[in-house]
Amino acid sequence: MEGALRRRGRVMTLSVRRLTPDDYDALRALRLESLRLYPECFAADPDQEDAMTKEEWLSRLSTAVSFGGFVDGVLSGMVVFSKPSRPKLAHTGDVGAMYVRDAARGTGLADALMTALIDHASENVEQIQLTVNAENPRAIKFYERHGFRPIGRIPRSLHVGDRYYDDLLMLRAVSTSD
């Protein structure tokens, strides 16, 4: 996907594509940024991820499908689709690591990323699920706009500092096959 957007009198080029090993440096920087700025929204620990080797990062790219959103050629957003390896779960997929830089919010980049993920998922699974911080109404509304529905609440799902956060479990059908 590629397109242009005019914002504050400036034309920006937006594009979304699957990330590759060539995107390692930008992907690593974006992921660590997301974990440090919004620790209550991600289960991963920034210090542990920062300590990962390049090979460990690249292994993730080979075991999941990572989409990158670019603004004027700069990686500014990401989302990851993963599929369980167990045969009984092969009809399901998971959405993870959804993040768009503050400067790129409101540009349509998040919508383009989620559309790319849903398009990919619809060719591979029947339903996709995700968890989202129950105190993040903007993210919840975003996922609802993309067809996700809350199906449960996970109390005290994350413990960050001295606070606990609940997560909502959300689900979306992407295929009508039985």
Where on the chain are the PLM-derived regions?
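Conserved beta-strand-loop-alpha-helix junction that forms the acyl-donor binding cleft
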Residues: L130-I140, S157-G161
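Acetyl-CoA-dependent GNAT
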Residues: P21-A29, E33-A103, M114-H120, A173-S177
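Conserved active-site alpha-helix within GNAT-family acetyltransferase domains
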Residues: T107, D111, E135-R153
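Conserved N-terminal entry element of GNAT/NAT acetyltransferase domains
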Residues: M1-D22, A29, E33, L168, ...
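Conserved GNAT acetyl-CoA-binding A-motif
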Residues: A121-T131
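Short hydrophobic/aromatic beta-strand or adjacent loop that forms the aromatic wall/cage
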Residues: A64, Y165-L169
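Glycine-rich acetyl-CoA-binding "A-motif" of GNAT/NAT acetyltransferases
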Residues: V74-G77, R138, Y164
